[in-house]
Each structure stands twice: as C-alpha cells, then as structure tokens.
Amino acid sequence: IAAIDMRRKNDVTFQKTLSFTDWYLDGGKGYPLGAVQLIGKVQGIMMKSFAKHVPLPLLNLVSDHSVEFVVMSEDLPHPENRVTIAQNGAIKIARKSVGMKTHMELLRRAKKTLRKTGYQAIFRQPFDISMNSHQCGTTVAGTDPRTSVVNGYCRSHDHHNLYLIDGGFFPSSAAMNPALTIAAQALRVVAESDLSKV
C-alpha cells in the first residue's frame, strides 16, 4: 500500500526500515494476520508499472509525498498447494489460498492506522503469484518418504547424496524474510550431516 499526504514531503533516497507485527496473532480461527513493513522508497517511474495511464510527472509528485508498505500475511501450508511438472514438461502451480479473510483484516487495520496518522489517501496494489518472493515450501520435510521429500536435515529421501537447502523445507514463511533462517538451516545441516568433511 502507498500512503499519501500532500502536506508532507518524503524525498528521501534510502528510507529507514520500519515494521510492526502488533496484530500478527490476532486473526482468530488459527490464521495469523501478518506483518506490515516499509519497502523502501518507491519512485514515480516504479509506480508507472501499475499506473500506466498516469503521467510520470504526477507519479513523481505522488512519490515525493508517500510512504510505501508491504502488507504480508502468512501463507499457511495446504496439502493441495503444490508445484508439479506436466507431461509436456510445463510447470503447473496449484495454490489454494486459505487466509484471505485474515489478510484483508490486516489490510483494513493497516489502512485505518495510517489514516489516523494523517495520511489523506491510501492506494492498494495487490500482487498475484507472478510477483513472487520469499518462496517457501514444496519440498515437505518429514520422516515418511510417502508424505515428505526430505528429512529434517534437508536430505532427499530418494537420493541420499542430495540436500535441498533452500526455503523448500519451510511449512510457511511466517510473513517474514526467510533468508537468515535458510542460512541457519544450511549451517545446521553442514554441522550435523558431516558435509564439512566432503
């Protein structure tokens, strides 16, 4: 979301980092709401990708008076969510979204809070699956090869010399950047699996 207040200029190049998770576990029914964080400073030319009909000078003006946040909810695991390869070699993505109600509640609360702080307009730009980051899942970790791809140390059940140390073993990203946890898991796998001796 972009929060705009034409009375306040925000012409920074490198915006400070801010994030809040005050409502993370406030979703009820087992679905967390998520996190809200600044995404850096969006420039007018960047806005052009989703506002093609708006003149660039106007987008630059808006950008000079806005702050931009990503409102990210946890994508909880679901057995029907999967990536497969079709007979013709095409990648097939099946995704069942189970937390949209709670995501919309998080979005509502974030907008309400930004309005209370004086922002005059708030614009939402939803991203579909083609705008992906923080990919997690698809190589389920577990002890049973019938229901999982890797063990707890990311070692493939089918190929014992193959370790899949990326975000695939996560059941969820927890609405956070998984990079540090992936790095920690890689160090754990190397230490516990004697890979350092290879």
Segments (PLM) and residue ranges:
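Fe(II)/2-oxoglutarate
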Residues: L56-L58, I85, L114-R115
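Structured loops at beta-to-helix junctions and adjacent beta-edge loops in soluble globular domains
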Residues: D5-R7, W23, V71-D75, G142-D144
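Short His/Asp/Glu-rich catalytic/ion-coordination signatures at enzyme active sites or charged loops
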Residues: N81-R95
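Glycine-rich loop(s) and the adjacent beta-strand/alpha-helix scaffold that form part
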Residues: I1-V12, D166, A179, Q185, ...
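A glycine-rich dinucleotide-binding beta-alpha-beta segment and adjacent secondary-structure elements
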Residues: E68-V70, K92-I93, V98-S173, A179
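A general structural signal for short secondary-structure junctions and capping/turn motifs
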Residues: N10, L58-S63, D75, S130-M131, ...
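Active-site beta-strand/loop architecture of penicillin-binding DD-peptidases
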Residues: S73-P79, S172
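Mid-to-C-terminal "cap/lid" subdomains and adjacent gly/pro-rich loops that border
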Residues: I1-V67, V198
